[in-house]
Amino acid sequence: MPSQNAVFSQEGNMEEEEMNDGSQMVRSQESLTFQDVAVDFTREEWDQLYPAQKNLYRDVMLENYRNLVALGYQLCKPEVIAQLELEEEWVIERDSLLDTHPDGENRPEIKKSTTSQNISDENQTHEMIMERLAGDSFWYSILGGLWDFDYHPEFNQENHKRYLGQVTLTHKKITQERSLECNKFAENCNLNSNLMQQRIPSIKIPLNSDTQGNSIKHNSDLIYYQGNYVRETPYEYSECGKIFNQHILLTDHIHTAEKPSECGKAFSHTSSLSQPQMLLTGEKPYKCDECGKRFSQRIHLIQHQRIHTGEKPFICNGCGKAFRQHSSFTQHLRIHTGEKPYKCNQCGKAFSRITSLTEHHRLHTGEKPYECGFCGKAFSQRTHLNQHERTHTGEKPYKCNECGKAFSQSAHLNQHRKIHTREKLCEYKCEQTVRHSPSFSST
């Protein structure tokens, strides 16, 4: 009899198979049926399942059906889906079996009814779609009523139809707590409170279809960003930066971590509820096992660990350049688009990076918030403080690959590298001169 873990593994394999099948679905929407993504059990197989495994089957079947509906397929609701939505135990009756298969086993029939649902109906208002998401969403049933849903519609220019581009989930109580903290932190640090709200944990679930109409991929294994399809990373949890290619892995990640008493929902660390305070106090509870460096936020530790592993999960679809951090990837995309969303309220100058805007503000205010712990000298930029502190510590983290010489600043290393470049250029010119000299030719 299969174990519960085996069924979880089977679900992951099933999702991978469905995503692979998506590239072959070049048929018209009218020819796609629910049976194409349904999973069948024989009577004997069904009797061997535990109740928890049957519940898992129910969740997967409902999710498959609702994904097709969300993508705009006009489907007649199968009888099995109607039963599963009522949370009735699916009992295989004699009169609900298909004809005997060639292998001699009977499989349950998926009957059609006259009921049809279409979540992307143009006549539906934002409130109606949100109500449908809250009432029917697989994620809502998994994560519970403490999550707020928001959707981001995409518009297909070819068929002039709207579809759900992405669903964002934010935790209600965490959002309220974090909003208060962000506002206080922004007030103390003279920052825009709207920018600080980006620290609120959220889950983004893309639900995109191929805009060329060539294929529909299960649950969308592509993220659509500013006209580019980028890397197969369906689910990213903003609180810790981890990426998951299966919803069940993300769910496990959220629910197996430590649970704050305030709301009962799980996050990667209890101190994630007070990260703004940690920034003020200087607390750094997250330590890298490789080099011992410490960080105040878990996402910064994860980003740092990619330096050791060499992982660069964010790939630009325009030029192929890869990045360790999503923020760097977003900033890079603005090179292609020319977007400068951060504008100075005093002089009107615009910037593509928020850090550039923050540093620019200090030209107007004269603020120097970064103070050296050794001598008390203050700086307007953290990078300048880091460079200055190395004069006290003697640290030289930038090393030349050619000769091994180390430097305290990257600018000094770049200047040093030009020496090797000039040396190589001189060697090349000398070699060419010797090659073309008469004495060399005569030999």
Swiss-Prot record:
Region (Disordered) residue spans: 1-23, 99-118
A Pfam match: zf-C2H2
Gene3D superfamilies linked to this entry: 6.10.140.140, Classic Zinc Finger
Main location: nucleus
Domain KRAB: 32-102
UniProt cross-references to InterPro entries, sorted A to Z: KRAB (IPR001909), KRAB_dom_sf (IPR036051), Znf_C2H2-type (IPR050758), Znf_C2H2_sf (IPR036236), Znf_C2H2_type (IPR013087)
Nucleus recorded as keyword: yes
Organs and tissues of expression: Expressed in fetal and adult brain.
C2H2-type zinc-finger residues: 255-280, 286-308, 314-336, 342-364, 370-392, 398-420
MF terms (GO), sorted A to Z: DNA-binding transcription factor activity, RNA polymerase II-specific; RNA polymerase II cis-regulatory region sequence-specific DNA binding; sequence-specific double-stranded DNA binding; zinc ion binding
CDD domains with a match to the protein in the record: KRAB_A-box
Keyword Disulfide bond: no
Keywords: Autism spectrum disorder, DNA-binding, Metal-binding, Nucleus, Repeat, Transcription, Transcription regulation, Zinc, Zinc-finger
Compartments, as annotated in UniProt: Nucleus
Polar residues bias (residue ranges): 1-10
Gene Ontology cellular component terms for the protein in this record: nucleus
Similarity comment: Belongs to the krueppel C2H2-type zinc-finger protein family.
Described purpose of this protein according to its UniProt entry: May be involved in transcriptional regulation.
Protein name, as recorded: Zinc finger protein 713
The organism of origin for this protein: Homo sapiens (Human)
Name of the encoding gene: ZNF713
